[in-house]
Amino acid sequence: MMETKQIYDDFLQYFNVEEIVSPGIYEKYNHLGDYFFLSRFDIRILATMVFIRTTLNKAITINDWLWGGRFDERGLRDTSTPMVQDRAKKNDPWLSAHVVGMAFDFDVKEMTANEVREWLFKFRDCLPYKIRLERKLNGEFISWVHLDVCDDPRNPKIYSFDV
């Protein structure tokens, strides 16, 4: 089993911490360094993303707010993010894998979300951990990849679900 620090260092070769946290959290805690942020994530999601990035050898985009993009809730969702705030205002219980550092939404350069999901199924035996993939939202295939490492022992290596 790989050491935590090695997984963190491998992850940082391909991703900036700004890609996985909100602007508010980054601004408040960036003085504590990258390992502080990474320690808030399940090690399985970090290792799985490194596997995907190195095996596909294609750029992956999670949050892009750092570069002026529109995505800022595709990694850790915290109390500064609108999705969490909106649910709290409605007193709507919500147990998202994003809130507990177990999920990423992402895009892979030059691949559609369906192509990425198909690729993951093809290489499922090589994945370091079991994963869950969101497929459809309100009956339509989503245009991004949602991947999480919530591990229900009743699920297969890759479990697809719709919301």
Across the structure, where does each feature detected by a protein language model lie?
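Active-site acidic/histidine clusters and adjacent loop/turn architecture
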Residues: 1-62
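Intrinsic-disorder/low-complexity loop/linker signature
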Residues: 24, 33, 75, 139-140, ...
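Short linear motifs at secondary-structure transitions and domain/linker junctions
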Residues: 36-39, 70-85, 115-124
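Extended, low-complexity, intrinsically disordered C-terminal regulatory tails
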Residues: 46-90
